[in-house]
Amino acid sequence: SRRQRQMCIRDSFIMANPPFNLSGWGADKLVDDVRWQYGTPPAGNANFAWLQHMIWHLAPNGRIGMVLANGSLSSQSGGEGEIRKNIINADLVDCIVAMPTQLFYTTQIPVSLWFLAKNKKQKGKTLFIDARKLGTMVTRKLRELTDEDIKKIADTYNAFVDGTLEDEKGFCAVVTTQDIAKQDYILTPGRYVGIEEQEDDGEPFEEKMGRLTSELSELFAKSHELETQIKERLGAIGYGL
């Protein structure tokens, strides 16, 4: 049958941007589907149905690039945590990129890029990239990634594959499957990349504290002055404090 022929298709490269958090996707008709190798997706959310559908159609050396809502990185509801755990333990997750907000015209849902591979170069490791600070607002509501932003992400991934990448605090980290397991198989990049190191401005600590304390003292004085003026004005109209 046509369906049987379609189920036999195996692709080397798959790119997908399926609808986010789709409910009512026909789960009841696909309860024992062969594609659910890592667990049956919940009826109320198709994210892991899409993901497993793509994995099923992947050739032995195939790769997937997929956009999913951020909930998929950490959700435990409806068995999603177990499915994610099984996919991670199958060593399929090559890279996760947390994207900045406002990249879409039609939704504000924050998203991530999932890169999966059947035959990863870096076995037992996953690259996490936190790209939430990248991009430029081109209108009040829409952000775009510049060519430099895209190159930074691509270069980081290529260095990971080559085994030459060094972790960059606040941006990227290479993490073993064992360490992901210690984080309950949650794939949120922010958990792994840490906080960006702040550049030392060279001002000695004692001087900085002295300056900031002095500025705070001035602000307190101004605040007290304003408080007095407000009380006087309220008093003048018969509402004295």
Where are these regions (language model features)?
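Short, small-residue-biased leader/transition segments that mark boundaries at the very start
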Residues: R2-I9
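A conserved structural/catalytic subdomain of Rossmann-like adenosyl-cofactor enzymes
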Residues: R10-Y239
